[in-house]
């Protein structure tokens, strides 16, 4: 079991200890780290909904470092990002591959960021099925439907023609930070946190 650092915050009410992720959640930062699967997706969705209830007008910052994973789990996060009222800014740290790349691109236009040494990878969904021969055709059709849906999502958020996205996701397609900007998956490569306007002007 991995160790989660704790931070201690001192207020006029005394000291209070938080795990690091809970403390960052107070700053409206949500981490999407590791394999995209049902449990992780439920936690991310719950955090997004909580932050919306806290302040529906203030941006949420989604930090992504993920190799991808379950399409259904990922689409639960995607749909929630589109559903809630706050804008969701996305930032790729490390990598955003497969479903992680879709979620990176799904951030608010103009607020999708990538660190300079991160990488992004897009491809078609992987299919694996074992069972009765009569069910293979059903699952093959479902994989094709999912693939078409994901390509439409990427086309919508990148501005690329659907036919181009279909071609570019035939095989694993790795992009550097700069290439991800050129493709339209993100809006900007950043190497330093930008200062708030008030500090920049002083």
From Swiss-Prot:
Subcellular location, record wording: Cytoplasm
Membrane-crossing residue ranges in chain numbering: none
EC nos: 3.4.21.92
UniProt catalytic activity: Hydrolysis of proteins to small peptides in the presence of ATP and magnesium. alpha-casein is the usual test substrate. In the absence of ATP, only oligopeptides shorter than five residues are hydrolyzed (such as succinyl-Leu-Tyr-|-NHMec, and Leu-Tyr-Leu-|-Tyr-Trp, in which cleavage of the -Tyr-|-Leu- and -Tyr-|-Trp bonds also occurs)
Underlying gene: clpP
Originating organism: Magnetococcus marinus (strain ATCC BAA-1437 / JCM 17883 / MC-1)
Single GO molecular function: ATPase binding
EC top class named in words: hydrolase
HAMAP family linked: ClpP
Active site residues per record: 98, 123
Protein name (record): ATP-dependent Clp protease proteolytic subunit
PANTHER family per the UniProt record, alphabetical: ATP-DEPENDENT CLP PROTEASE PROTEOLYTIC SUBUNIT
GO cellular component, one term: cytoplasm
């Amino acid at each position: 079991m991995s160790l989660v650092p704790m931070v201690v915050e001192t207020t006029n009410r005394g000291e209070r200890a938080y795990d690091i992720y809970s403390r960052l959640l107070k700053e409206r930062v949500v981490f999407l780290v590791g394999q995209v699967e049902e449990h992780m997706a439920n936690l991310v969705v719950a955090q997004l909904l909580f932050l919306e209830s806290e302040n529906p007008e203030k941006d949420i910052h989604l930090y992504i470092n993920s190799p991808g994973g379950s399409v259904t789990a990922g689409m639960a996060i995607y749909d929630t990002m589109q559903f809630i009222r706050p804008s969701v800014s996305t930032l790729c740290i490390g990598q955003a591959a497969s479903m992680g790349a879709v979620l990176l691109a799904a951030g608010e236009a103009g607020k999708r960021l990538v660190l300079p040494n991160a990488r992004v990878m897009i491809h078609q969904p992987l299919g694996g099925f074992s069972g009765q021969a009569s069910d293979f055709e059903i699952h093959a059709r479902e994989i094709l439907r999912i693939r078409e849906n994901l390509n439409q999502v990427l086309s919508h958020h990148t501005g690329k023609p659907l036919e181009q996205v279909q071609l570019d996701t035939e095989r694993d397609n790795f992009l550097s930070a700069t290439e991800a900007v050129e493709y339209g998956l993100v809006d900007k490569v950043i190497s330093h946190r930008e200062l708030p306007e008030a500090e920049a002007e002083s």
